[in-house]
Amino acid sequence: MAQRIKEEVKSEIEKLKEKGIESTLAVVIVGNDPASRSYVNSKKRTCLELGINSVEYALDTTTTQEQLENLIEKLNQDPKINGILVQLPLPNGLDESRVCKKILPQKDVDGFHPMNVGMLATGIDFEYSIKPCTPFGVIELLKRENIEIKGKHAVVIGRSNIVGKPLALLLLRENATVTICHSYTRDLKDICKTADILVAAVGKPKFVTADMVKEGAVVIDVGINRDETTKKIVGDVDFETVRRVASYITPVPGGVGPMTVAMLMKNTLFATLLQNGLI
């Protein structure tokens, strides 16, 4: 699925190149967190594969808020830069929300700028907004798998600004009836059992078990956790037990993770089209 989306993006990038238009993503990484470095390398490899130019700005941990914001302003003003991605989390002492607000909305390929979030929430100029990659990827996955969303009860476990909230808004837009659950939700198991579509985005390994899932439900696992016993990467869903109950389930690794990277590339293409007046 993710590969198919990447091939579509590659084809569109090639068409732009025939018109003399290049697509360039600026990737900013602060510090030397191994997970962040791994994510950045993966994104750069994907850019190379699809014909998108990528420029990395690696800053050390002593970087100040002002220095980081000055770099973003420089990238905002550079007409050759179509997308700006600041790899999160940032080291302590740097304000992530200020950084997200500093990026021009039309270059905000993560979809975190308040203007993009506002367009998503209100539906005003929705078609011109850049959507957060993971929620966008979940919706795209459901649609391409021909899973009915309209009229279904979707339960999202997790209310983060990166996944839970925007995904709930996108599901609403697709005419699902949406329930958001979080750490203060009462009777969580009973609520989950009513879900036609259950999305786990809590960051707790194997949190969703088979007794929380309705027979035939669609289960989307957004979690990426390390199992402390086996040291393997696992999701928020106990895959082996839940797969026996669900009609459809996404694995971890795989599943949503590759879709997130594919949607980042799609967003970079979208930003390029937007800035060239092609949307």
UniProtKB/Swiss-Prot annotation:
Q: Which reaction does it catalyse?
A: (6R)-5,10-methylene-5,6,7,8-tetrahydrofolate + NADP(+) = (6R)-5,10-methenyltetrahydrofolate + NADPH; (6R)-5,10-methenyltetrahydrofolate + H2O = (6R)-10-formyltetrahydrofolate + H(+)
Q: Which residues form a coiled coil?
A: none
What are the protein's UniProt keywords? Amino-acid biosynthesis, Histidine biosynthesis, Hydrolase, Methionine biosynthesis, Multifunctional enzyme, NADP, One-carbon metabolism, Oxidoreductase, Purine biosynthesis
Residues reported in the UniProt entry to bind NADP(+): G158, R159, S160, S183, I224
Annotated Gene3D superfamilies: Leucine Dehydrogenase, chain A, domain 1, NAD(P)-binding Rossmann-like Domain
**According to the UniProt entry, what is the EC number of this protein?**
1.5.1.5, 3.5.4.9
Ion transport recorded as keyword: no
An example Gene Ontology CC term for this record:
cytosol
GO BP annotations of the record are: L-histidine biosynthetic process; methionine biosynthetic process; purine nucleotide biosynthetic process; tetrahydrofolate interconversion
Q: Does the keyword Phosphoprotein apply?
A: no
The record's section on PANTHER family has:
C-1-TETRAHYDROFOLATE SYNTHASE, CYTOPLASMIC (PTHR48099:SF5), C-1-TETRAHYDROFOLATE SYNTHASE, CYTOPLASMIC-RELATED (PTHR48099)
Q: Which HAMAP family match?
A: THF_DHG_CYH
Functional summary from the UniProt entry:
Catalyzes the oxidation of 5,10-methylenetetrahydrofolate to 5,10-methenyltetrahydrofolate and then the hydrolysis of 5,10-methenyltetrahydrofolate to 10-formyltetrahydrofolate.
Query: What family does the database annotate?
Result: Belongs to the tetrahydrofolate dehydrogenase/cyclohydrolase family.
Q: What is this protein called?
A: Bifunctional protein FolD
Recorded source organism is Caldicellulosiruptor saccharolyticus (strain ATCC 43494 / DSM 8903 / Tp8T 6331)
Task: Please state the gene responsible for encoding this protein.
Answer: folD
